[in-house]
Amino acid sequence: MDFIEAKEEYAAAQRRAQKEYKELLAANKDPNPAVLDELLDDNSARVVQDIGLLEIPAERIVGTRAAGRVSTFSASFLPLAKPSSEFAVKWMNLCQAHMGEVGIRDPITCYEYLGNFYVEEGNKRVSVLRYYGAPCIAGMVKRILPARSDEPRIKAYYEFLEFYKSSKLYTVQFRRPGDYAKLLGLLGKELGDPWSEDERRTFSAYFHYFLDAFHGLDVFDKDILPEEALLMWLKIHSYKELGSMTATQLRKSLTELWPDVVTSTKQAEFVEAGPVTENKPGIINWIMNSIPDRVHVAFVHQLDAATSPWVLGHEEGRRHLEETFGYQVVCRSYFNANSDDAAALLIEQAIDEGAQIIFTTAPKLNRITLKFAVKYPKLHFFNCSVDLPYSSVRAYYGRIFEAKFITGAIAGAMAQNDRIGYVGSNPIVGVPASNNAFALGALMTNPRAQIELRWSCCEGTPQADFFRDGIRVISNRDVPSQNKMYMEFCNYGTYQMDDRGGLIPLASPVWVWGKFYQIVVESALAGTLKDDKINLRAVNYWLGMDSGVIDVSLSDRLPIGVRMMAELLRKSMRERTLDPFRRKLTTQDGIVISDGSRRLSPDELLRMDWLCHNVSGSIPSFDEILPMSRSIVRELGIYKDQIPAIKETNA
């Protein structure tokens, strides 16, 4: 390359720089490279590690160490200086060197901070190499470690450092804790597993292939990271598919998933009522005949009704639909979706048989539900879970803590020695809120009440332990059905034990799934069942006693005064004039969570990870949980981001 050609290349690079500069200015974004000195707090002590020579991903070089000549570059290090400037001449000389036999061989020197690189020496080398599309740039690197904190980005960075020890990859930089563990699991690896050189090269190639598709989207959103999009993509596609798809297929698959990619980076929306039914459909809908007079509904269950009370409760909901709507609804149930392959076959069968609304009734089915929801965007998919970040699949669950508060009040009134046993299910979202609501209910009727907490997901025999310790009032698993047989003849709900271990039922929270299913079908028949993908909303229906989805079953053996109190509490809860958590809340450690002047948000209630001051016991760690309970804790656990990744068998 001669100097005239180098001058032409500079002019082309400058035009690109000016275009980028104007676009960033118009978007109210910094048009120049970032400056590390401006990002760091001058007063904080910093640890600097000498990393040595690295091949740095070019897109990770985002700024300079000091302000210096930062104004001579656009944000991606393209040159802005006049062609007649000394800077431009040096850039052209480097351009000639790069295109010559020798090339640019000297490494740059830079600092790494939070996964990005800031050049101290070699800005023009970076500019030339990035202009020519070099994927990596050699550099001598020093790492600046931020002070540890609970800030999500800092926690995610320290997780990256553990990821880097094995992978030696800088290509992915997550900003949410737990995402590295998720990625490793989706790749079929665990934290600490060694990466071969072949695996590194393959992942880097696949990621850059995905990056091209990501940046080629018409709906590209710079607030979403490509690695976050990849994480969502891998939830419904295997890692092997990433290497086998054509560029067109990959871009199409990412476009179809895009609404869910967007919502996965946002806070999920909790709706404390069912789908809207009161809005009347417009005249156009009537003219176009789009309002159905009959709806086909499918229920896909992980187990079967003969062995699972949970499935039996949902089947009662199906029968409620048939009794309520008659000809207007066609319901079919599909059982034993106990693996992804089995679930896929059953959902496909349901669709082939005409299903328009599909309910998958177990949290573990959420990913396979998402896969089909993306594949069939005109159908409506619901998963019985909570806190799902998808716009294609709506989650639905119940505010069971409301009923737990009432059974806690009953237990407090009935506990003669002030001690009450409580058997928790699993440490998943919403369960600590139920534990605490029960404890607060007990305090309302007995200010001396002490709750002894045990867990059914851990080793041990809680009921036998309580009996041996002299505890005679116990709260156990919730009644899954409106059939009172469960409460009267089994160890469900809250009950007393006599001195021989006999059970006397008192009350239990009850799931009434038919109420929710009725709301959905009414909305569909009215033509008002909305498509949340249009508004990029991740909707989670979280319904309480006011909706009828949650209720309390009261035993005929309750003393009349206690029953009257429970009826009054139930009425207040249904009218939403009673909030169990609108009071002073103090943890076991004496920390005041709230002074009672406000309502806790749905997010605070679902992610509650503390126990009330009158609870003895603790929330179990993942290692303490029995293997049979670990899958649900991985899916919905309150500490799921801290759980080691599990290898995906189809990665």
Walk through the language-model features, giving the residues of each.
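Short, charged/polar connector segments at secondary-structure boundaries
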Residues: M1-E120, Y131, R176-G188, H215, ...
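A short, basic-hydrophobic beta/loop patch
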Residues: G103-Y118, N123-A156
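Extracytoplasmic "Venus flytrap"
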Residues: H296-E316, L321, R332-D340, G430-P432
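Periplasmic-binding protein-like
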Residues: G354-P363, F382-C384, I471-P480, L503-W511
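Flexible loop/hinge segments that line or gate small-molecule binding clefts
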Residues: V374-Y397
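Hydrophobic alpha-helical segments within soluble ligand-binding/sensing domains
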Residues: Y396-D418, V510-D531
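An alpha-beta-alpha
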Residues: I406-N446, R537-R557
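Segments of small-molecule ligand-sensing domains
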Residues: G527-N650
